[in-house]
C-alpha cells in the first residue's frame, strides 16, 4: 500500500490518498508534481484505493506532496515517515 499526503496551504492536516499499486501511486505523484510545477492552478481528481473515495481539488491550494510505502512493520516509537526540517534562528 502506498500513501500520498497532499499538504494544503493554511491547513495543518494533510489529505491522504491510498494506492495499492506502486505504478498507480507513482503516476498520481507525478501528475501532482507536474501540476505544481506548471505554476498555474489546475483541477485534480484522485481516487483512494483503500476506501474508493475521491477528492477533487485545485492545485493552487497545494504546497507539497509526499509519497510513502507502508510496510508490515510499525515505525519505531510511533514516528511517521517523512522529512524533518531544521530551522535556524
UniProtKB/Swiss-Prot annotation:
Segments for region (Disordered): 69-89
Alphabetical list of InterPro entries matching this protein: UPF0367 (IPR020885)
Similarity remark: Belongs to the UPF0367 family.
Name of this chain's protein: UPF0367 protein CYB_2632
